[in-house]
Protein backbone atom coordinates (compact mmCIF):
# COMPACT_ATOMS: atom_id res chain seq x y z
CA UNK A 1 0.00 0.00 0.00
CA UNK A 2 0.88 3.67 0.03
CA UNK A 3 3.54 4.99 2.40
CA UNK A 4 3.25 8.68 1.50
CA UNK A 5 0.01 10.58 0.91
CA UNK A 6 0.24 13.84 -1.02
CA UNK A 7 -2.32 16.45 0.01
CA UNK A 8 -2.78 18.32 -3.25
CA UNK A 9 -3.42 22.09 -3.07
CA UNK A 10 -3.97 21.59 0.64
CA UNK A 11 -3.80 25.28 1.56
CA UNK A 12 -7.15 25.85 -0.16
CA UNK A 13 -9.01 23.20 1.85
CA UNK A 14 -10.46 25.21 4.77
CA UNK A 15 -12.97 27.86 3.67
CA UNK A 16 -14.65 30.64 5.63
CA UNK A 17 -16.62 33.76 4.60
CA UNK A 18 -14.53 36.91 4.59
CA UNK A 19 -11.17 35.13 4.70
CA UNK A 20 -8.63 34.88 1.89
CA UNK A 21 -9.20 31.09 1.83
CA UNK A 22 -5.57 30.30 1.22
CA UNK A 23 -3.78 28.92 4.24
CA UNK A 24 -6.41 30.19 6.66
CA UNK A 25 -4.85 30.31 10.10
CA UNK A 26 -5.41 28.40 12.34
CA UNK A 27 -7.95 26.30 10.38
CA UNK A 28 -5.43 24.94 7.85
CA UNK A 29 -3.06 23.68 10.53
CA UNK A 30 -5.88 22.28 12.66
CA UNK A 31 -7.20 20.35 9.66
CA UNK A 32 -3.70 19.07 8.88
CA UNK A 33 -3.36 17.86 12.47
CA UNK A 34 -6.68 16.01 12.21
CA UNK A 35 -5.49 14.22 9.07
CA UNK A 36 -2.18 13.44 10.76
CA UNK A 37 -4.01 11.79 13.66
CA UNK A 38 -5.81 9.53 11.18
CA UNK A 39 -2.68 8.77 9.17
CA UNK A 40 -0.15 8.18 11.95
CA UNK A 41 -1.61 4.88 13.24
CA UNK A 42 -1.41 3.56 9.68
CA UNK A 43 2.24 4.52 9.34
CA UNK A 44 1.48 7.05 6.61
CA UNK A 45 3.62 10.09 5.92
CA UNK A 46 1.75 13.23 4.85
CA UNK A 47 3.13 15.53 2.17
CA UNK A 48 1.17 18.81 2.05
CA UNK A 49 1.48 20.37 -1.41
CA UNK A 50 1.51 24.14 -0.94
CA UNK A 51 2.63 26.69 -3.52
CA UNK A 52 3.77 29.92 -1.89
CA UNK A 53 6.45 32.53 -2.44
CA UNK A 54 9.77 32.00 -0.68
CA UNK A 55 9.34 35.34 1.08
CA UNK A 56 6.24 34.03 2.88
CA UNK A 57 8.39 31.38 4.64
CA UNK A 58 5.59 28.81 4.67
CA UNK A 59 8.18 26.09 4.07
CA UNK A 60 9.65 26.98 7.47
CA UNK A 61 6.26 26.71 9.14
CA UNK A 62 5.84 23.23 7.63
CA UNK A 63 9.30 22.26 8.86
CA UNK A 64 8.57 23.56 12.36
CA UNK A 65 5.41 21.42 12.43
CA UNK A 66 7.36 18.32 11.42
CA UNK A 67 6.32 18.03 7.77
CA UNK A 68 8.37 17.83 4.61
CA UNK A 69 7.89 20.57 2.05
CA UNK A 70 7.76 20.38 -1.72
CA UNK A 71 10.86 22.16 -3.00
CA UNK A 72 9.17 24.24 -5.67
CA UNK A 73 12.14 26.62 -5.62
CA UNK A 74 14.58 24.12 -7.16
CA UNK A 75 13.25 23.99 -10.77
CA UNK A 76 13.68 27.71 -11.37
CA UNK A 77 16.93 27.94 -9.43
CA UNK A 78 18.51 25.18 -11.52
CA UNK A 79 17.48 26.86 -14.79
CA UNK A 80 18.84 30.15 -13.47
CA UNK A 81 22.14 28.50 -12.51
CA UNK A 82 22.58 26.75 -15.86
CA UNK A 83 21.45 29.54 -18.16
CA UNK A 84 23.10 32.42 -16.28
CA UNK A 85 26.22 30.44 -15.36
CA UNK A 86 25.99 31.27 -11.68
CA UNK A 87 25.29 29.19 -8.61
CA UNK A 88 24.93 31.77 -5.84
CA UNK A 89 21.14 31.65 -5.48
CA UNK A 90 21.03 27.86 -5.80
CA UNK A 91 23.85 27.48 -3.27
CA UNK A 92 22.13 29.87 -0.86
CA UNK A 93 19.00 27.72 -0.90
CA UNK A 94 20.99 24.48 -0.54
CA UNK A 95 22.82 25.90 2.49
CA UNK A 96 19.53 26.94 4.07
CA UNK A 97 18.04 23.46 3.60
CA UNK A 98 21.07 21.89 5.30
CA UNK A 99 21.64 24.48 8.03
CA UNK A 100 17.98 24.71 9.06
CA UNK A 101 17.38 20.95 8.65
CA UNK A 102 14.45 21.48 6.28
CA UNK A 103 13.03 18.20 4.99
CA UNK A 104 12.20 18.49 1.29
CA UNK A 105 10.81 16.51 -1.61
CA UNK A 106 12.21 18.04 -4.77
CA UNK A 107 11.41 17.94 -8.47
CA UNK A 108 12.28 19.59 -11.77
CA UNK A 109 9.50 19.09 -14.33
CA UNK A 110 5.91 18.26 -13.47
CA UNK A 111 2.46 18.11 -15.05
CA UNK A 112 1.75 21.73 -14.06
CA UNK A 113 4.90 23.12 -15.67
CA UNK A 114 7.61 25.14 -13.95
CA UNK A 115 6.70 27.10 -10.79
CA UNK A 116 8.14 30.60 -10.72
CA UNK A 117 5.87 32.55 -8.37
CA UNK A 118 7.52 30.57 -5.59
CA UNK A 119 10.87 32.28 -6.28
CA UNK A 120 9.69 35.71 -5.08
CA UNK A 121 12.02 36.81 -2.33
CA UNK A 122 14.73 34.37 -3.39
CA UNK A 123 15.46 35.65 -6.91
CA UNK A 124 15.17 39.32 -7.93
CA UNK A 125 11.87 39.95 -9.72
CA UNK A 126 13.64 41.10 -12.90
CA UNK A 127 15.46 37.78 -12.99
CA UNK A 128 12.20 35.89 -12.54
CA UNK A 129 10.74 37.86 -15.44
CA UNK A 130 13.81 36.98 -17.55
CA UNK A 131 13.34 33.29 -16.77
CA UNK A 132 9.72 33.50 -17.90
CA UNK A 133 10.70 35.24 -21.12
CA UNK A 134 13.41 32.66 -21.82
CA UNK A 135 11.11 29.67 -21.29
CA UNK A 136 8.32 31.27 -23.33
CA UNK A 137 10.81 31.95 -26.14
CA UNK A 138 11.49 28.20 -26.16
CA UNK A 139 7.83 27.33 -26.59
CA UNK A 140 6.51 27.62 -23.06
CA UNK A 141 3.07 29.04 -22.42
CA UNK A 142 1.65 31.14 -19.59
CA UNK A 143 -1.98 30.87 -18.59
CA UNK A 144 -2.79 34.18 -16.95
CA UNK A 145 -5.70 33.45 -14.64
CA UNK A 146 -5.44 36.31 -12.20
CA UNK A 147 -4.19 39.38 -14.06
CA UNK A 148 -0.79 40.85 -14.82
CA UNK A 149 0.42 41.11 -11.23
CA UNK A 150 0.26 37.33 -10.84
CA UNK A 151 1.34 36.39 -14.35
CA UNK A 152 4.35 34.38 -13.26
CA UNK A 153 2.62 31.54 -11.47
CA UNK A 154 3.72 28.55 -13.55
CA UNK A 155 5.08 28.43 -17.06
CA UNK A 156 3.60 25.49 -18.94
CA UNK A 157 6.59 23.72 -20.44
CA UNK A 158 8.44 20.46 -20.10
CA UNK A 159 11.76 20.83 -18.33
CA UNK A 160 13.63 19.53 -21.35
CA UNK A 161 12.09 22.17 -23.60
CA UNK A 162 12.67 24.86 -20.97
CA UNK A 163 16.37 24.03 -21.18
CA UNK A 164 16.36 24.48 -24.94
CA UNK A 165 16.07 20.71 -25.54
CA UNK A 166 19.74 20.33 -24.70
CA UNK A 167 20.76 16.84 -23.59
CA UNK A 168 23.80 18.12 -21.70
CA UNK A 169 21.78 20.74 -19.80
CA UNK A 170 19.11 18.19 -18.92
CA UNK A 171 21.70 15.73 -17.61
CA UNK A 172 23.36 18.47 -15.57
CA UNK A 173 20.01 19.58 -14.14
CA UNK A 174 19.15 16.00 -13.16
CA UNK A 175 22.56 15.51 -11.55
CA UNK A 176 22.07 18.67 -9.48
CA UNK A 177 18.67 17.42 -8.36
CA UNK A 178 20.01 14.01 -7.35
CA UNK A 179 22.76 15.56 -5.22
CA UNK A 180 20.50 18.24 -3.74
CA UNK A 181 19.39 17.61 -0.14
CA UNK A 182 15.94 16.03 -0.11
CA UNK A 183 14.03 13.17 -1.71
CA UNK A 184 14.00 13.48 -5.51
CA UNK A 185 10.91 12.90 -7.61
CA UNK A 186 11.16 12.45 -11.38
CA UNK A 187 8.18 13.15 -13.63
CA UNK A 188 7.72 10.25 -16.05
CA UNK A 189 7.82 12.53 -19.12
CA UNK A 190 11.22 13.83 -18.07
CA UNK A 191 12.59 10.29 -18.18
CA UNK A 192 12.02 10.33 -21.94
CA UNK A 193 13.16 13.93 -22.52
CA UNK A 194 9.60 14.90 -23.36
CA UNK A 195 9.17 18.03 -25.49
CA UNK A 196 6.42 20.63 -25.55
CA UNK A 197 3.47 19.37 -27.59
CA UNK A 198 1.65 22.42 -28.92
CA UNK A 199 -0.62 20.33 -31.14
CA UNK A 200 -1.92 18.47 -28.09
CA UNK A 201 -2.57 21.80 -26.39
CA UNK A 202 -4.51 22.99 -29.44
CA UNK A 203 -6.61 19.82 -29.50
CA UNK A 204 -7.38 20.05 -25.78
CA UNK A 205 -8.56 23.66 -26.01
CA UNK A 206 -9.35 25.87 -23.04
CA UNK A 207 -10.76 22.98 -21.02
CA UNK A 208 -7.62 20.89 -21.36
CA UNK A 209 -4.92 20.54 -18.74
CA UNK A 210 -1.73 22.57 -18.91
CA UNK A 211 0.92 19.99 -19.70
Task: Give the label of every model feature segment.
Residues 1-211:
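Active-site and adjacent substrate-binding regions of carbohydrate-active enzymes
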Amino acid sequence: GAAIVRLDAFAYAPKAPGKKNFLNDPETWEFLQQIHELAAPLGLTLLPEIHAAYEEKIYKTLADKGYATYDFFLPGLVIDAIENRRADYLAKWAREVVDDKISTVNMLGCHDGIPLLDLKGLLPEDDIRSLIDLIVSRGGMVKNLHGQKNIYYQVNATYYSALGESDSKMLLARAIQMFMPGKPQVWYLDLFAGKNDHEAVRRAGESGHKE
